[in-house]
Amino acid sequence: MKNLCSMVEISVEDFNRAKEFYESILEIEITEMNVLDTQIGMFPMEEYLNLGCISKCDQHIPSKNGTLIYLNADNNIAGMLKKVISAGGEILTPKTKLGDQFGFVAVFLDTEGNRIALHAQK
């Protein structure tokens, strides 16, 4: 198996606020759609294995206490953390080294109350 994760779905309460937040920090354009009464915002897809979205659904509740996903910071964690603050997020863990082999991570709280991590090799 090449990649263990095939899709990431981030639950949101305020779809427009979350869309603006993630478009700002990731510098992407989110495509909106509705599927089975769920408002979905798809991240751009270059490869099938890099699929992600935000979703607003009554059954999904944003949380900082559950699974932690790591977004690719493209070797610019410091720059992305600045964007997180500008877009209304909160830094929970600043850029931290994961030993000599695994790069760096940081953790933030998004505008919806989700705990999200960033990862980069440098």
Each predicted region: which residue ranges?
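Short alpha-helical
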Residues: N16-R17, T38, L49, N75-G79
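Vicinal oxygen chelate
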Residues: N3, C5-E13, T31-V35, M42, Q59-I85, F104-L109, ...
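N-terminal beta-strand motif that seeds the catalytic metal site of vicinal oxygen chelate
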Residues: M1-K19, E47-L49, T67-I69, K122
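N-terminal first-folded block
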Residues: M7, S11-F43
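Conserved short beta-strand elements that form part of the metal-binding/catalytic scaffold
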Residues: E29-K64, R115-A120
